[in-house]
Amino acid sequence: MSKVITFGEIMLRLKSPGLERFFQSPSLEATFGGGEANVAVSLANYGMEAGYITVLPDNDISKACLRELRGFGVDVSNVTYGEGRFGIYFLESGANQRPSKVIYDRAYSSIALAKPGDVDFVKAFGDATWFHITGITPAVSETAAELSLEAVKTAKKMGLTVSCDLNFRKNLWKYGKEAKEVMSELTKYVDVIIANEEDCQKSLGIENNQKVESGELDTKKYEELAKAVLDKYPDAKKIAITLRESKSASHNNWSACIYNRKEFYVSKKYEIKNIVDRVGGGDSFAGGLIYGLNNYETDAQALEFAVAASCLKHSIGGDFNRASLSEVKALMGGDGSGRVQR
């Protein structure tokens, strides 16, 4: 049976209630979230063995966080305690023409201070078959980037399949290196690349010239982009690219494509109106894709599962995708009516 390990930072998520602006009312909703943890939760939720590695301060907030992850069935036995603090991000959900806003407070977090050798990846990967990482943790600090590179090199050496969601975050790359410099090296060790057009441009230096703000996307250009990425990274086996047509903060069209050096496939498109929470939508796609590639015969089926999983996440508040395996399969199979299930 496949076991997936993810590695990265989990944060305290502080969100303004509903669609309010920051401190429009004197309260913030506190939950936890982080790209790699979100993927682990999705996989555990679908019945796969999933483990999560991070570095946290030894305090009550960390213990509450780990209790929540255990509650989803995620193995956190390889979490390491270190110096520093628990990272935070603040979220204000957008509506219509007002975009969502994220403010990071991650300086001097435990994972930002962590360095190569602080995590026993050999032990953590002992019974695993798949390792997943993102481009977020390498953006936090230079030592976190070095630790991330150590992780992918170790996973590759031990024979694990390695996936990476490039996840470019412009507000995080502050320590003197550009994303392209760091991620171009890390991606050399990746088997399955997950990205959007901005990730390919900012993290890998590969242009697409697609205007996502127009609300309409040309899939032919994405096929060219996918081929260009795999041409640059000959050891990568496939790339999945998410296609988000943003009509407004509340209304998106959502689909994706996958290329495996032989075939290029574009998924069905979902029109998502009245978005509840799009944060974690990309992580839900990544988790769905990893599940699909481990449980379906074709890449096309895996992609359809991933897109359906992510579509459902847009209807669920919080970072974690709480959609069940049966719900994802039902939507994947064409039941998107939203009718009451009795």
List each language-model region with its residue ranges:
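Positively charged, low-complexity intrinsically disordered leader regions
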Residues: 1-21
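Short catalytic helix/loop segments, enriched in acidic residues and glycine
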Residues: 21-39
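Alpha-helix C-terminal capping segments
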Residues: 31, 38-49, 292-295
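Conserved N-terminal subdomain of the carbohydrate kinase-like
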Residues: 49-136, 328-342
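Hydrophobic beta-strand scaffold residues
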Residues: 50, 76, 162-163, 194
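A short helix->loop->beta-strand "cap" motif at the edges of active sites that frequently abuts
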Residues: 156-161, 233-237
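Conserved phosphate/ATP/ADP-binding segment of small-molecule kinases
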Residues: 172-262
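Conserved post-catalytic alpha-helical subdomain immediately downstream of the catalytic base
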Residues: 265-335
